[in-house]
């Protein structure tokens, strides 16, 4: 409660603003802070919004978002359409930023340099680990390897239980009925197991 959350959109809506300055200074921002950030990131705020390039629009959006003094920054593809100098400037700013930020990005270098925690949307589920993106590949390999080991163990146990069932259950003893129920449960568990994406 009381935290200021600011979204840096992937495609800022500039159609109702004549200039980048009009856009960047709209809302609850300090104009001199916007101008200072714009100077640092290298954007001419007097450019007309309609003719500004994607990179210029992105820089104006960054100046606006950072000047809002957020507690939490939501970054949607923050390095998209930026040149190397602007990306480096943003990385430097974020490395000194004392608030929190959540980034959705395909820029692996950006994520590796700045992140401390990773959320992985995996086959319909969510996983979280306190590692930066630099450790993501090792983490996924570890998860998939553990899943494969679990599946192998379950397959071996299923094979034994299926063999027991095929030999025939001679009596309706509670023990046998319980074992059959457990077998059905194992079958369902195995059927629900998914391999890594791209496997069947």
Predicted ranges, named:
Residues 1-151, 200:
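ABC ATP-binding cassette signature C-motif
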Residues 142-200:
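Flexible nucleotide-interacting loop at or near the entrance of a catalytic core
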